[in-house]
């Protein structure tokens, strides 16, 4: 991922994202209001990535409903983003951004 895209993501997210994703072959995410405060998906997926020697990482992305459209637009332009999961209340709103 380019540093500019990383910086753009950092501006709209409410949590810090690790710079380690800049060096990953790919990354995934759990998107919601505050998955950084307790979502266990990153723990599960990151241990799987490590076990299978994948240079990948799942990160939580805390985003407001207001910034969800911006986030989805940014993620579509990042080749190393390979998908992920979404929590309520974003789960219903995010459907219109998925092809």
Where are these regions (language model features)?
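Short N-terminal or domain-adjacent regulatory/targeting segments
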Residues: 1-20
């Amino acid at each position: 991922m380019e540093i500019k895209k990383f910086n753009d993501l950092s501006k709209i997210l409410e949590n810090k994202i690790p710079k380690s994703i800049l060096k990953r072959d790919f990354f995934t995410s759990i998107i919601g209001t505050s998955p950084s405060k307790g979502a266990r998906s990153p723990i599960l997926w990151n241990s799987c990535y490590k076990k299978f020697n994948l240079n990948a990482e799942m990160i939580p992305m805390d985003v407001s409903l207001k910034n969800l459209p911006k986030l989805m637009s940014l993620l579509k332009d990042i080749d190393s983003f390979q998908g992920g999961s979404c929590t309520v209340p974003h789960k219903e709103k995010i459907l219109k951004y998925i092809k």
